[in-house]
Amino acid sequence: MGSSAGSWRRLEDSEREETDSEPQAPRLDSRSVLWKNAVGFWILGLCNNFSYVVMLSAAHDILKQEQASGNQSHVEPGPTPTPHNSSSRFDCNSISTAAVLLADILPTLVIKLLAPLGLHLLPYSPRVLVSGVCSAGSFVLVAFSQSVGLSLCGVVLASISSGLGEVTFLSLTAFYPSAVISWWSSGTGGAGLLGSLSYLGLTQAGLSPQHTLLSMLGIPVLLLASYFLLLTSPEPLDPGGENEAETAARQPLIGTETPESKPGASWDLSLQERWTVFKGLLWYIIPLVLVYFAEYFINQGLFELLFFRNTSLSHAQQYRWYQMLYQAGVFASRSSLQCCRIRFTWVLALLQCLNLALLLADVCLNFLPSIYLIFIIILYEGLLGGAAYVNTFHNIALETSDKHREFAMEAACISDTLGISLSGVLALPLHDFLCHLP
C-alpha cells in the first residue's frame, strides 16, 4: 500500500511507545473510532436515500392528484377498492409512475455525469449541506403542492439531494477503511426498507400523504448531524483499510499503480488516466446498469399494471406493498457482504433480466394466479439488486489503487443511475401502450 501503509504503521508504533503503561487504551480508542465511522456511514446511507425512496413510494399518490383536489385528502386505510379505468383492464393513472421515476433520477444522472470532471474541486462540507437542504425542501414542496407539476419539482429536489450525496459519500469512503462501504450500502438498503415501510405504515394508519411527508423532516437533520458530529477525521486511518492478504490479492484496474499512490490525489489525474481507469471499470459498470435497468423497469413500468382486483388491497395499497417488499430485499442483500461476496456480478444481471421477462409476460398474458406469487418475485428482485450494488462497489474498492480509488468510486456511481434512467424512458411509452389495450 506504499507510503500510506507505512505512515499507518509508524503511527501505531509511536502510539505503542507512548502508552506502554496502558497498552489497551489505543486499541480501545481505535475500536471506538472504527465503530463511530461505521455507524456514521450507515446513517449517512440511510438518510441520503430516504427522500428518494419515499418519493417513489408516493408516486401513485402524487399522480392521483390529477383526479383529486390536491394531496391533502385523507387516505382511506380500509379495503375499499378504488374506481377502475373502464377503458382498460388496467387501473391506470393518466401518467405512468415512470414520470416520477424520471424526475427522481435524471437530475442525479446529470450530477453523476459531471462529478468526475470537477465536483472534487468543491469541499465535502458544502456538498453535504446542499444535499441536506434539498432533501428537506423536497418533503416540504411535495407535501404542500396542489399540482402534479409542482410535486415533480419537489421530486427533483430529492433527486439532487440523493445524487449529490451518493457521489460525495462514496468518494469519501476512499479515505476510510474499506469496511465502511458495506456499512454505507447497508444504510442505503435500510433507507429503502424504512422509507417505503414508514410511508406504507403511516398512510395505512390513516395519515394523509401531506402529514406523512412532513413527519420525515427529521431525516435531513440526522444526515447533517451524522456527517458533522459523528464521523471522525480520516487522517489517522489507513484509507484502504485492507489487511496484507487483501492488498496482495488486489488486481489493479490499470497497470500504472505506483507504490507511493494514495487516496486524495484524484484531482491530479490526467484525462488520459481517468479514461484508462474508466475503461477498466466497465467490467463492473455494465452488469450494474443492466441490473438496475431491469429492476426499475419492473418497479416503475410494471408495478402499477400488476393489479389484482380480487384482493382486499386497493390499487394504491398494492403499489405500496410492492415497493416495501422490493426495498426489504434490497436491504437484506446490501447488508450481506460479510456473509456472501459475489465477484461475477454479470450473473445477477442475467437473473434480473429473467425477472423482467417473467413479469412483463404476466402483465400481457395475466397467467400468475395470486398476488402472493408477485410478492415473492418482487422480494427476490430486491435481493438481486441489492447484491449487485454492494458487491460492485466492494470489488471496485479492492481492485483499484489508492491513487485512483476516489475517482473510480465517483465514476462507477453512474451505473445504477444510467440503468434507472433508461428504464424510465422506455417505461413511459409502454405504460401508454398497455393502458390503451381493451
Swiss-Prot record:
Residues in the Cytoplasmic compartment per record: 1-37, 149-151, 204-277, 368-438
Membrane-topology annotation of the record: Multi-pass membrane protein
Region (Disordered): 1-27, 67-87, 239-261
Tissue: Expressed throughout the brain, such as, in the cerebral cortex, hippocampus, cerebellum and several different cerebral nuclei (at protein level). In the cerebral cortex, expressed in all cortical layers. In the hippocampus, expressed in the granule cells in the dentate gyrus and the pyramidal cells of the hippocampus proper. In the cerebellum expressed in the granular and molecular layers, and in the Purkinje cell layer.
Pfam families: CLN3
Entries under InterPro entries matching the protein: Battenin_disease_Cln3, Battenin_disease_Cln3_subgr, MFS_trans_sf
Transmembrane segments: 38-58, 128-148, 152-172, 183-203, 278-298, 347-367
Subcellular location: Lysosome membrane; Late endosome; Lysosome; Membrane raft
Propeptide: 436-438
Residues bearing PTM Cysteine methyl ester: 435
Gene Ontology CC terms, in alphabetical order: autolysosome; autophagosome; caveola; cytoplasm; cytoplasmic vesicle; cytosol; early endosome; early endosome membrane
Gene Ontology molecular function: any one: sulfatide binding
Description of the deletion phenotype: Embryos are viable and fertile and by 12 months of age do not exhibit obvious clinical signs but have significantly shortened life spans. Mice show elevation of lysosomal enzymes in brain and accumulation of autofluorescent storage material in neurons, retina and other cell types that increases with age. They also show neuropathological abnormalities with loss of certain cortical interneurons and hypertrophy of many interneuron populations in the hippocampus.
Keywords assigned: Cytoplasmic vesicle, Endosome, Glycoprotein, Golgi apparatus, Lipoprotein, Lysosome, Membrane, Methylation, Phosphoprotein, Prenylation, Synapse, Synaptosome, Transmembrane, Transmembrane helix, Transport
Protein's job: Mediates microtubule-dependent, anterograde transport connecting the Golgi network, endosomes, autophagosomes, lysosomes and plasma membrane, and participates in several cellular processes such as regulation of lysosomal pH, lysosome protein degradation, receptor-mediated endocytosis, autophagy, transport of proteins and lipids from the TGN, apoptosis and synaptic transmission.
Protein name: Battenin
Record organism: Mus musculus (Mouse)
Gene designation per UniProt: Cln3
